[in-house]
A protein has these predicted regions:
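Globin-like tetrapyrrole-binding proteins
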Residues: 63-64, 70-194
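A short, conserved beta-strand element enriched in hydrophobic/aromatic residues
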Residues: 1-71, 110-113
Length: 194
């Protein structure tokens, strides 16, 4: 979730202020961000869309393995082929395939709950997004000095929405795509310089 607000037009035409969500995958070897999809609320359908974008648009091939978060969207039965609580993967029939295997991914590995550091590459990327992208928007309501909740920036988001000062979701995605491809992806990761 970005720490800035955008104007979102619901299917019924009502415009509200939301914090957009980003679904994306990081290639651990190159640190490239692939399959980025922005949405109002992330769910397993958004993750499917993100993986399909990764395969057909960004990477042009299916990843052999993926490392997934422990969230319910990533571990839903239609994604993995197994019940969320079945860590032993005891399915033996074709019904246990799930979306990941159905598109050609050989295997997936789940992060342990409350161990954010095992997903270091994507978590570090989200920190970079906050520091180098999100903070520059007028609607930014994250922290300026650290990660303390009491240090969050107060803004009149409803007033900004009424005055038309918030970017639309499409405008925000356009700014995001520009930043991702023209600023982030052109720099070599310091972890790869060794």
């Amino acid at each position: 979730t970005f720490d800035c607000w955008v104007a979102y037009t619901a299917p019924n035409g009502k415009v509200t202020a939301i914090k957009p969500h980003l679904a994306a995958w990081v290639d651990v070897r190159s640190r490239m961000i692939l399959g980025d999809v922005m949405c109002k609320d992330a769910n397993s359908d958004i993750l499917k869309e993100s993986l399909l974008k990764l395969i057909y648009h960004d990477a042009g091939s299916v990843p052999q393995y993926i490392y997934i978060d422990n969230g319910k969207d990533y571990t839903a039965k239609d994604m993995t082929g197994f019940d969320r609580d079945d860590r032993q993967r005891t399915g033996f029939d074709d019904a246990a395939v799930g979306f990941y295997k159905s598109i050609g991914i050989e295997d997936f590995h789940r992060a342990l709950p409350y161990y954010a550091w095992v997903k270091g590459q994507i978590e570090r990327f989200f920190g970079t997004v906050c520091g180098r992208f999100s903070k520059w928007f007028m609607s930014y309501t994250g922290t300026l000095t650290g990660s303390k909740t009491f240090a969050k920036v107060e803004k009149d988001i409803d007033g900004m929405l009424e005055r038309g000062e918030l970017l639309t979701m499409d405008e925000f995605y356009e700014a995001w795509t520009n930043w991702l491809h023209n600023f982030y992806m052109v720099k070599q990761s310091s972890a790869l310089k060794r």
